[in-house]
Amino acid sequence: MQFLAVAALLFTTALAAPSSDVNGIIRRANAFCPEGLLYTNPLCCDLDVLGVADVDCVVPPAKPSSCKSFGSVCASIGRKPRCCAVPVAGVALLCTDPIPAI
C-alpha cells in the first residue's frame, strides 16, 4: 500500500515537471507569468486585497501573446492582469504581477 502511494507521488511529480524541446530549452505555458508550480495561471482580476489575494478573477477573453498584450486584454474588460495559483470560486488566493517585458 505504501509502495503505491510513493509510486503515485513520483508519477505526479514527473508529470508536473516542465518539458523541454530538442535544444534543452524549457517550454513555458506563457512568457509573462513566473515559472514553477505557483503563479502560472494568467487571470484578469477586479479587486486586489493587500497585493496577495484577488477577487472576481476571470480567464482573459483573448489569449495574450506577451506581457503587454496581457495587460491590454485585461484592461479592455476593466480588470488588472495577474498571475495566480489555481483560483477557488472566483477568488485567487495567491497572485503576483506578471513578468514585465524586457
Curated annotation (Swiss-Prot):
Residues 1-16 form the signal peptide. Disulfide bonds join 33-83, 44-74, 45-57, 84-95. It is found in: Secreted, Cell wall; Secreted; Cytoplasm. Its main location: secreted. Expressed in the conidia, vegetative growth and induction growth stages. Disruption phenotype: Leads to a wettable phenotype and to a significantly reduced conidial production. Also exhibits less biomass formation but does not affect the stress susceptibility. Induction: Expressed on carbon sources that induce lignocellulytic enzymes such as lactose, xylan, avicel and cellobiose, with the highest expression level detected on cellobiose and the lowest on lactose. InterPro entries: Cerato-ulmin_hydrophobin, Hydrophobin_sf. It holds the Pfam family Hydrophobin_2. Keywords: Cell wall, Cytoplasm, Disulfide bond, Secreted, Signal. The keyword Hydrolase does not apply. Belongs to the cerato-ulmin hydrophobin family. Aerial growth, conidiation, and dispersal of filamentous fungi in the environment rely upon a capability of their secreting small amphipathic proteins called hydrophobins (HPBs) with low sequence identity. Class I can self-assemble into an outermost layer of rodlet bundles on aerial cell surfaces, conferring cellular hydrophobicity that supports fungal growth, development and dispersal; whereas Class II form highly ordered films at water-air interfaces through intermolecular interactions but contribute nothing to the rodlet structure. Homotetramer. Further self-assembles to form highly ordered films at water-air interfaces through intermolecular interactions. PANTHER family: HYDROPHOBIN (PTHR42341:SF1). This is Class II hydrophobin 3. It comes from Hypocrea jecorina (strain QM6a) (Trichoderma reesei).
